[in-house]
Amino acid sequence: MNTRDKIINHALKVSCDIYKANKVFVLSNKNRQSETIKAKRMFIYYLYTYMEINHNGMKKYFKSINHASSIHHVNKFKFEVETYKDVSSSFNKFLTEMKKFSMYGGGFYEKRVEIKRLLDELKQITND
C-alpha cells in the first residue's frame, strides 16, 4: 500500500468515526442510513477537493458509483458545510484529524501547499 492509499484509508476511517458509520456500507451503495450518507459525502468531498481525485476516479474507491453521483455528493456536502454549523464543525474536526496524520515526517498538507506555491512561482518565472 502506497502513502497516498494510506492517507485515503485514514480519511475513510476518520469520516466513519465522526458519523459512527460502517466502512463497508460507506463504500457500497447498499445502505441509505443518514450516518452512512453523511460519512460518504464527507469522504467523497475530501477525495475530490483535497486528494484531487476526479469524479470518474471515484470508481476506484466505491462500488457502483458514477460521476454524476460523485458530483452530487460533492456539491451537496459543499452546500451543507457552508450552510450548517454542525456539518462545518464535523468537517473541521475531520480536517484536524487528517492534518495530524502525517506520512512524511512533516504535514502532508503543508508540503502540498508549498509545492503548489513553488509551481506557481516557476510558472511566473517562465512566463516573464
Predicted regions and their residues:
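N-terminal leader segment of winged-helix/HTH proteins
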Residues: N2-V14
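Helix-turn-helix DNA-binding elements, focusing on the entry/boundary residues of the two helices
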Residues: L12, N54-N56
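Short, Lys/Arg-enriched anionic-surface-contact patches
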Residues: V14-K40, I65
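Short, amphipathic alpha-helical "recognition" segments used to contact nucleic acids or chromatin
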Residues: I37-I53
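DNA major-groove recognition helix of helix-turn-helix
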Residues: Y48, H73-V74, K78-V81
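Short, basic interhelical loop/turn and adjoining N-cap
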Residues: N56, K60-H73
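Short Lys/Arg-enriched helix C-cap and helix-to-coil transition segments
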Residues: V81-Y109
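Short, low-complexity, charged amphipathic interaction modules
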Residues: G107-D128
